[in-house]
Each structure stands twice: as structure tokens, then as C-alpha cells.
Amino acid sequence: MFEITRPPGVRAHVGVIGGSGLYDPGIVENPVEVKVSTPYGNPSDFIVVGDVAGVKVAFLPRHGRGHRIPPHAINYRANIWALKALGVKWVISVSAVGSLREDYRPGDFVVPDQFIDMTKNRRHYTFYDGPVTVHVSMADPFCEDLRQRLIDSGRRLGYTVHERGTYVCIEGPRFSTRAESRVWKDVFKADIIGMTLVPEINLACEAQLCYATLAMVTDYDVWADRPVTAEEVERVMISNVERARRMLYDVIPKLAGEPELERCSCCRALDTAAI
């Protein structure tokens, strides 16, 4: 159902999708830029394939280098397809988020376990537009195995890592109104807010990839009666990004093997999804 032609001679095992602030593929050694063609057009940028402690890693800046693609205009299907085409099994998505809780502070990390989709149906949510259709289960949308590895990595490094959280994904590119922010916080009971998780996570599930998000808290959303500015977000992001790099260096060598089937069902996501 998901037929992929891999670029000759290039393979990767772990994919890293860099979000706001993490555009630099300098996390890998022996980097090679790879252009991957997909049925859905071009990914956000060239994919840089290289090594981290002997593990082949494919790095893709979600917004393109220089942050030139806004959240609603990202070609999510091409991005996920391209990583799958390179042979990737694990995908670590790094994202900047706002906090909807006092105890999730700027500078903290969150490894979310749930999401709420508040995008506006302007994005492409599936690879299966017909005649084949699938209905993947999203009851527990993130790879629990990969989530736990990220949590363990953050703790080894002494960082504040919140091991659960509900991510509400809004359309963007604007930030929330104060009324909206209070709805996400008080009515939806969400914990963090961002603009890029959906449909990236849906597509990763359809591609049967192990996917988890490392969310970097950059600000309290405007429920806290403080306006959010791009300058504020960028200031916190600079310090967060270096710590995110250290987490990637720590966790990627531990992903050298295949996903463990007893801990993860991601590679079987389509087994019962077709009707």
C-alpha cells in the first residue's frame, strides 16, 4: 500500500525534523545533502544525511533553512515521504511550543503523549486520498518506546522534562487571542500549544514510523496576561536549542537497533486500518 523508491546509495535510520530554531544540520558528521523527489512535490529543504556516533541520521529543517516556510504552508506529505524513502525507522520531531500551565516553564522540555487538532482543514492530512483509504488509530498517537527514550535522555542530562502533555495544534501563523488561549487551557485542558504537529504525526503513523516530539517551551501563551512576541520566543529558543542538541546526541546512539515490537506497534499501524 505504501510503495517507496529509495534514492540509490543513500540510507538513514533516524530522522530528525528540526523545528523553529533548529535549522542547522551541524548535528551530523560527514554530511551529504540529498534531494529526494516525492509524489507530493519537494520537501521543505534538502535532507542532510550524516552520522551521529555511527548511526545514520537524516536531518530535515521543517520550515526550510532560514525559516522561510510558515506552518500552514509546509509540505508535510513530502517531508514524511522523503524520510520514509531514505529508510528511516525513528523520527524525532523538535518543536517550539507555548505553555498553557504555570508549572511548564520557559526553558523546560515536554514529551507529549496526546494532541488536539485545531487546524482548519487547509493541510493535507493523509497519503490515502482514494481509491484506497485507511483509518489509522490515533488513540495513543506517539511512539511510547521513543517517548520514553527521550524522557530518559533528558533526565540523564539533568534537564526538566515533563513526561506527559496534551499538545493543541493551531493553524497559525498568528499566535492565539487571549480568549482562544484560555479555551485551550481551561476548557480543552491542553498543556502546550504549537502549529506544526498536525498533520505531521498523522502522516508518520500512516508511514508506520516511530514518531515522538521533543517540545521546547519558549513562552507562556497569552492566557497569562502577557503578550507573546517573536523576540521573546527567539531569546528562550536560543538556549533551548543547544540543550536539544545535547539530547539528540545522547539519544540517537541508543536508536541504532530496530524498534522493539513488544514495546511499539508503530510498524503495524496499517494492519487493521484499511476498509
From Swiss-Prot:
Coiled coil: none annotated. It comes from Aeropyrum pernix (strain ATCC 700893 / DSM 11879 / JCM 9820 / NBRC 100138 / K1). One of its GO terms (cellular component) is cytosol. This is S-methyl-5'-thioadenosine phosphorylase. Pathway: Amino-acid biosynthesis; L-methionine biosynthesis via salvage pathway; S-methyl-5-thio-alpha-D-ribose 1-phosphate from S-methyl-5'-thioadenosine (phosphorylase route): step 1/1. It comes from the Archaea. Its EC number is 2.4.2.28. Pfam families: PNP_UDP_1. The gene is mtnP. Catalyzes the reversible phosphorylation of S-methyl-5'-thioadenosine (MTA) to adenine and 5-methylthioribose-1-phosphate. Involved in the breakdown of MTA, a major by-product of polyamine biosynthesis. Responsible for the first step in the methionine salvage pathway after MTA has been generated from S-adenosylmethionine. Has broad substrate specificity with 6-aminopurine nucleosides as preferred substrates. CDD domains: MTAP_SsMTAPII_like_MTIP (cd09010). Keywords: Disulfide bond, Glycosyltransferase, Purine salvage, Transferase. One of its GO terms (biological process) is L-methionine salvage from methylthioadenosine. InterPro entries: MTAP, Nucleoside_phosphorylase_d, Nucleoside_phosphorylase_sf, Purine_phosphorylase-2_CS. Substrate binds at residues 195, 219-221.
